Amino acid sequence: MKKIILALTTFLLAISLTACSSAKPEDTIDSFFNSAKKFDFEGMNKVMENNDEKYKDILKELDTKDPNAQYVLDYLKQNASKITYTIKDSEVKGDKATIKVECKFIDSTPLLQEIVAEAFTKMIGMSFSGQDLTDEKTTEMLVSIMKEKQKSVKETYVTKNVEFECSKKDNKWIISSVNDAVADVLLSNLVTAGQEFSNS
């Protein structure tokens, strides 16, 4: 499960996209989000520049036979499908453009807080009873808690701004860079939530 989250995060933080036939930079943004909302990395790869190897690594991680990892992956896919976005500003200067996008998406932080709190209590009990906590047992326990907590934790949304830097090459607009907020948008705020837990 950790490998999947890490692979997805690495992929999203290294995005460098190119549109196949975009007349406007906004079209490139639409192409990106249309594939991203489907968690369609093959579709995203078609508009990427020099990311073939990263894409292959992603597919390898996503091709999992572990039911627990698949459950988490399905959760992220379902959340991604609910992303909404609005292009708030488009500033074009010659062959350069800055596109500011407001994204609304599911915030997994409340669910993660509940999972961590219960897991911590259970792991202390297991430790005192002498039970061996393998990675497999830990993952199984976390997903079991996740399934239970999803029944009671209310689905909440958060809004973040993503800024895309675009450039025009050969009459096509490409995304040359994007800020790190895009990873939170596509991974239900897991990146920020994970950092907060690590620092607490």
Protein language model features and the residues they cover:
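C-terminal motif of bacterial Sec signal peptides marking the signal peptidase cleavage site
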Residues: S16-A19
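Intrinsically disordered, low-complexity acidic Ser/Thr-rich regulatory segments
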Residues: L73-K77, T138-Y157
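Positively charged n-region of N-terminal signal peptides that target proteins for export
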Residues: M1-I4, L8-F11
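Core segments of small alpha/beta cavity-forming domains
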Residues: S21-P67, Y71-I87
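Short beta-strand edge/turn micro-motifs at domain boundaries
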Residues: A119-K137, S152-S198
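Residue-level signal for tight coil/turn positions that link beta-strands
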Residues: V92-K96, D170
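Short, cysteine-centered beta-strand-loop-beta hairpins and adjacent loop/turn segments enriched
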Residues: K104-K122
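A short hydrophobic beta-strand element
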Residues: D95-F105
